[in-house]
Design a protein with these regions (language model features):
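A SIS-like phosphosugar-recognition module
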Residues: 1-184
Length: 184
């Protein structure tokens, strides 16, 4: 069992290289940039992926972003969703896939743009999405690795499109100075 997991881990760099070469990241940033709010929703181990992506988008591109677990989103925050928002549904195969599908159904039903990070063969969530990013097939436990990297690259392009330096986190603006005043 450990050998199988080790082999799957060893394959991830090549899978990511292939994935990163498949998408037109600048074009995606152009299509989905400048929106009111961005939602990143995942289940299982990809709750952390959703939180991290929202944090990075806020830091790098100065955009309003929120990361949520599927059940959190479906409990109440969905009511704040608007048609101009973008919802990234991080839904590789695994136990959380069904609830991620529910998230995509709600978001699409409201008229928000859905971007699905799913297995290439996924037709359930993929059919609801304006764009799909096909993730390599790995166990759900390893999927945060394969989902976080393309999101980071897309967020970089969101930042560049917005004219923000993704490495400075507004250090030279009143925002950065205000935060620095409370950080030792």
């Amino acid at each position: 069992h450990d050998d199988e997991l080790g082999h799957q881990l060893d394959a991830i760099p090549d899978q990511l290289a292939f994935l990163l070469g498949q998408e037109a990241w600048e074009s995606l940033a152009e299509r989905f940039g400048g929106r009111r709010r961005y939602w990143f929703v995942g289940g299982g181990p990809n709750v952390a992926t959703a939180y991290e992506a929202a944090l990075k988008l806020s830091e790098a591109a100065w955009a309003s972003a929120i990361g949520l677990e599927c059940e959190q989103f479906l409990h109440g925050p969905w009511a704040a969703l608007e048609p101009d928002d973008v919802v990234f549904v991080i839904a590789p195969p695994g136990p959380s896939h069904a609830r991620c599908h529910d998230v995509a159904r709600v978001a699409a039903g409201i008229g928000a743009t859905v971007v699905a990070l799913v297995a290439e063969a996924d037709r359930e969530i993929g059919s609801l999405a304006a764009e799909t990013i096909a993730l390599p097939e790995v166990p759900e436990l390893l999927s945060p690795i394969t989902a976080a990297v393309p999101l980071q690259l897309l967020i970089y392009h969101f930042a560049v499109r917005a004219g923000a330096n993704p490495d400075t986190v507004r250090e030279q603006t009143p925002h950065g100075r205000a935060r620095a005043s409370v950080t030792p």
